[in-house]
Amino acid sequence: MPKREDLKSVLVIGSGPIVIGQAAEFDYSGTQALRVLKEEGLRVILVNSNPATIMTDPEFADATYVEPITPEVVEKIIAKERPDALLPTLGGQTALNTAIALDKNGVLAKYNVELIGANIAAIELGEDREKFKGVVERCGAESARSHIVHAMDEALVAAADLGYPLVVRPSFTMGGLGSGLAYNEKDLHRIAGAGLQYSPTSEVLLEESILGWKEYELEMMRDKNDNVVVVCSIENFDPVGVHTGDSITVAPAMTLTDREYQNLRDISIAVIREVGVDTGGCNIQFAIEPDTGRVVVIEMNPRVSRSSALASKATGFAIAKIATKLSLGYTLDEIPNDITQKTPASFEPTLDYVVVKVPRFAFEKFPAADPTLTTTMKSVGEAMAIGRNFTEALQKALRSLEQKGSQLDFGSVNALDVPELIEAAKRPTTDRLGQVQRALAGGASVEDLYAATGIDPWFLEQLQLLNEVAVELKQAPQLHESLLRKAKRHGFSDEQIAGLTNNAEAVVRGVRQALGIRPVYKTVDTCAAEFAAYTPYHYSSYDQEDEIALHEKPSVIILGSGPNRIGQGIEFDYSCVHASMALRKAGYETVMVNCNPETVSTDYDVSTRLYFEPLTLEDVLEVIAAEERTGGVMGVFVQLGGQTPLKLAQDLADAGVPILGTPPEAIDLAEHRGQFARVLDIAGLIAPKNGAAVSFEDAKRVADEIGYPVLVRPSYVLGGRGMEIVYDEPNLLRYITNATEITPDHPVLIDRFLEDAIEIDVDALYDGKELYLGGVMEHIEEAGIHSGDSACVLPPITLGQGVVDRVRDATQAIAEGVGVRGLINIQFALASDVLYVLEANPRASRTVPFVSKATGVQLAKAAALIGTGVTINQLRTAYKMIPSLPGTPGGFDGGSLPVGAPVAVKEAVLPFSRFRTPEGAVVDSLLGPEMRSTGEVMGIDKHFDTAFAKSQAAANNALPTEGKVFVSVANRDKRAVIMAVKLLADLGFEIVSTGGTADVLRRNGIQSSTVRKVAEGTSAEGEGTITDLIIAGEIDMVFNTPSGGEARGDGYEIRAAAISIGIPCITTVAEFNVAVLAIEAMRSFEWNVTSLQEHAEALLEAAANV
């Protein structure tokens, strides 16, 4: 059936901010979908609150709404745009839940909007656990025995029937939020209690434990003519009990017999038919009991998911793109496969390689969190690698993580340590893979480890094989060709071989190259080379035949940012993709090197060629060598992907590779304290007093000179890793004692901490002569909170033009002094009207996408062209990429936005609800100099107060417009909050506070009821404490600033209670003052929805009328 002609416009719902469990894979699938819809000639309307996505670029939709994804806001967009259809299957759980709400409350019917890509009945059958159980039974398969409960007393009755341990799963949450394993009644109270709150339907499923069974998933697609394809089978390395997003996964499944696989296939096809998914994809998860072979269907997702992004990258089969075409009425046999151009989408992909995905965690950011892996997803990113066998793919994936200790350690193991390693491996943690491999190296048997961990013996034998190769390397008198080739085929890096043979890495590389042992590059082509592939999507292997074609023009290589992590996320991928788009448009051949399966950059048609490879020096040099021998290399971009490629800059330059854009010397100069201080001196700028120390004596001397409080941190970090504000000498001693690896090359840096300063963030472009100021952002929280976690506003709302002009001059001087060609990000602090320079980063920063969306100027594209020699003047005139000069008609830049320009607020999204201490409490939500957010949202409006209110709603932290507010602040903050609290009381809010704060408020004529502190406990009359009130749902917002020492305990309990039930919890005075303004605005004005395209027109109009 050809496509439907009755649909003229479609509204697509995105997935909002990046949170654990719902990450960049939805930007990847959404971007593909928008392209298809545009190609098919539809008017496309998008709503997505995340500015760091490619899909919110104005060119991908006709109307792009960066607005909170809530049913109320989406209804406003529907009323304004009147779309014919709504496509909700590309925005994860957020989009599905919103679509279900709009259907239930009659909005879709009222405006005559049809749901495409999924029907509500199919979603409910797939997502509602009770209904899905019925589906599985009707298909002749079985589910785990279970009970659905809606209250705690029902849960206790169910537990008596099922027996402990049992699995708790709330309905309609994603990434396993609120789920867990209850081993006893106490656990059940804790986990099911939270689960009932997290589930939008207050419904929780309790099921028998299938812990230790083998877990598999199948990724499926079905069209309305009942054609079904299995895109890919995926096997989890860890048995059931670890969320699939936190497990190492392998495609295709390795340990199924053909009969077992056909059985899973038959069940899947029956289930997808019974559920009625007929225009798209879904994934179905299974558990198999290893001893009996009993198969249980765990669950299905009737939408594009994290697994489908992985399956797409693993097979080259564009699931999101094909699902979108199906939703428009096409069938699988009518859709051509882009890669082969000969086969239709109804051909199932065939793999002649192995794919391994390994998760990346961020437990170092939450030292209090319990690192045990459970059914609640905790990983923040993932790396994927492709090899000709499992061992090669596994080792490549582990080195792609770029984490200390992520690679296998082949050092010798004492036999006495083996029992301890086996015991430790029983509990799934991030270290389990290493523990298992080392236990095997120490002589443990495969049987023992299988009994302890439930990891399939086939995987254990593969680890044993790696240990054997390592032993051979250790014992070899010299490196001979057959041994070296064998090691490379099992994925050993030059660095690992050097360690095992007591050589330098450069020596191993020299010997290997002299022996002619180089990798060849194979192609991911969906058909195991049965047909020719037209899209070069490559992976390396130490095999025989090379499959790279010759190219005519020298290539421009862009190094991506590797796996997502806190501090380096999708924002850097955005800059890489923009660079590739701009350079291709300008006629260059672009080559992307990256190993993150979730991102747009690793889509097979974003660049001219894609290499799915780890971002290590060895792997990158081999890609460059391959490009050199097939047509030459013009140069490499290292400043777009964050810290990952920057670290390689100097080594690449030393190897003779041309670096485009800012040279490595300039990158080093900005990172090096002494040299950078000279740049500031010449420019007449000042930094906060600072020093460096390699011992406690040094540190004490520096801190005494500067004066406390001081900010201490290691050199060369991204995301503020290991930073702390230290208020006194005992704490300085503690920091230095705990700081690892202080060396003369890597000293600890100590800065004066500026209290009560306004922090300012600048993104700019510099071409060697001229500066274009991209944006000047003012932070809402005071200095001392990491810029990645602080809310900020553009244009700045309290800085006068005089300050902005000083910022512009300082930026020009620094860019010139450092020698930047392209993007630079500088952080300033304004204290007592003195402008301090905090740091300069000569690279694409985390705020580039936000600034680009807020001002309509795409900075990363411009920076890529500057890297190839284009000037800012040419970008203005010939390329029309940046506006004309400020002061000329229609001219402006990020430091001179006209009055009437829209105001944009960026807010961070924090993952505290995911991380629990071993006792089950939430980790503390206090912000500090170490970055902890996983993603961001943007609120944009004509007025600052409304823009701030939108940003809070988008960050799932909507401000209340009535009710009770709890206020408890440290003594130093009491004066600063009186006016704002009075305004809340005047607006009709009821103020609740503890002793000291209540007295101050009453003396200022503010009515406030007093409540008991946590430490006071429940009174004899049964009056509860503040945390009891919060947990009972009686408080609508918490405002609590920490005061040192003892009250930290009290404050922590209060903040943890607020986070655990999901009410706004504000911890800084600055943010509270702004929140009160926003609440007042929400009560007085109806907010409007405006598309980025309309904001851009308003901005140009305002500039023309200056």
From Swiss-Prot:
Keyword Oxidoreductase attributed: no
Ranges where the ATP-grasp domain occurs: 133-328, 677-868
Sites where the protein binds Mg(2+) 4: E839, N841
Binding residues annotated for ATP 1, in chain numbering: R129, R169, G175, G176, E208, I210, E215, G241, V242, H243, Q285, E299
KW Oxidoreductase (keyword) present: no
Gene Ontology biological-process annotations: 'de novo' UMP biosynthetic process; glutamine metabolic process; L-arginine biosynthetic process
Binding locations of Mn(2+) 2: E299, N301
Binding site residues for Mg(2+) 1: Q285, E299
GO CC terms, sorted: cytoplasm
Annotated binding of ATP 2, by residue: R713, R752, L754, E759, G784, I785, H786, S787, Q827, E839
InterPro entries (alphabetical): ATP-grasp, ATP_grasp_subdomain_1, CarbamoylP_synth_lsu, CarbamoylP_synth_lsu_oligo, CarbamoylP_synth_lsu_oligo_sf, CbamoylP_synth_lsu-like_ATP-bd, CbamoylP_synth_lsu_CPSase_dom, MGS-like_dom
Alphabetic keyword roster: Amino-acid biosynthesis, Arginine biosynthesis, ATP-binding, Ligase, Magnesium, Manganese, Metal-binding, Nucleotide-binding, Pyrimidine biosynthesis, Repeat
Cited Gene3D superfamilies: 3.40.50.20, ATP-grasp fold, A domain, ATP-grasp fold, B domain, Carbamoyl-phosphate synthetase, large subunit oligomerisation domain, Methylglyoxal synthase-like domain
Record comment regarding domains: The large subunit is composed of 2 ATP-grasp domains that are involved in binding the 2 ATP molecules needed for carbamoyl phosphate synthesis. The N-terminal ATP-grasp domain (referred to as the carboxyphosphate synthetic component) catalyzes the ATP-dependent phosphorylation of hydrogencarbonate to carboxyphosphate and the subsequent nucleophilic attack by ammonia to form a carbamate intermediate.
Full protein name: Carbamoyl phosphate synthase large chain
Gene: carB
